[in-house]
Amino acid sequence: MISARPFTSGSALSNASNTLVVYHTSSATGRDVAVSGVISIPKGKPPAAGWPVISWAHGTTGNAPQCAPSRFATPNVEQRFLNDWVDAGYAVVQTDYEGEGTPGLHPYFANAAGAHDTIDIVHAARAIDPQIGERWVVMGHSEGGTIALFAAEIAPSWAPDLQLLGAVSYAPAADITDVLGHIMTSSQPMRGLPLGMMMVEGIASTDPAIDLNRILSPHGLALLPQLQSACAGEMMNSPAWNAVAPNSLFQRDAPVNRLIHDFAANEPLNLAIHVPLLLEQGTADELVSPDITSALHANLCANGVPAELDTIAGANHDSVMARTRDSVKEWVAARFAGARIVRQTCR
């Protein structure tokens, strides 16, 4: 633990006692880094085993420090959703991720880093409040949905002092290598281009063998500072991005084999997860294709992961959280109650 102070800003969970923490964790390359986050504890008396914990991995906000959820002026859709979990009697811990809320670049989709952040904030929570229990469930949305999968794989070895009971992943991004291929070859402007370039910058930042000066065009290099100074929503609505031909940001015949390799290594298709897993996906998701999540589910099932997939008719990228609130609460409560039988959708 580096620091802890009461947290009452606009993004604090209104139904909890909130603490802003800065804590030690490990980067994707093994460096010690300082990461911020918020610990939200229900009001009242904890159960005998201590507060059950939900560690939340948030969706895409940006690669710059000011994009941290703890810096939001008002609660976003995820934080409003998390208030319900506090009301249900869970301590909710939310990492900001490396490079968001603290100095440095956020290694977007270098998922080992996000997994470390998401696990170690549980350690930070237990360090400041002994009434927080050792049993926890990891949950996440979008970028965080993918991070939750990576955290579920490494948690038993990374944090053997904690007891991970399950994982819930909402609309995880599982096809990032396809995203890279699309932005390198497409001449058609696309609103999601900043997200693709955030992946390029974030993943490249963890591998010294990748030199973006040899991969990106002068135009692409000129746009990099925006990735480090603006948040995702701002860039996605900016003409500087949404009028650009994606392939113009890359050099012709650039040496991208290492970058492609690293993108593939950060896809969750072949993870070995040994706790119950619940995937939630809306059919009207405008960012993550239901077909991609179905393929992810099939891959994980083939790997022996005890996985369930719920596909929610008409739910979009954000509304899938609210639409599945009651069923996911029931699923999580069963994990804390010690239920071992999971409704399998692997066939």
Language-model region placement:
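Catalytic-loop region of hydrolases
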Residues: 1-46, 301
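Short, surface-exposed "cap/lid" segments of acyl-processing enzymes
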Residues: 28-36, 40-87
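Alpha/beta-hydrolase active-site loop
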Residues: 108-130
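Primarily recognizes the serine-hydrolase "nucleophile elbow" in alpha/beta-hydrolase
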Residues: 123-193
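Accessory cap/linker subdomain of secreted extracellular hydrolases
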Residues: 170-268
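C-terminal catalytic histidine-bearing segment of alpha/beta-hydrolase fold enzymes
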Residues: 251, 255, 260-261, 287, ...
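Short beta-strand/loop motif that positions the catalytic acidic residue
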Residues: 273, 278-285
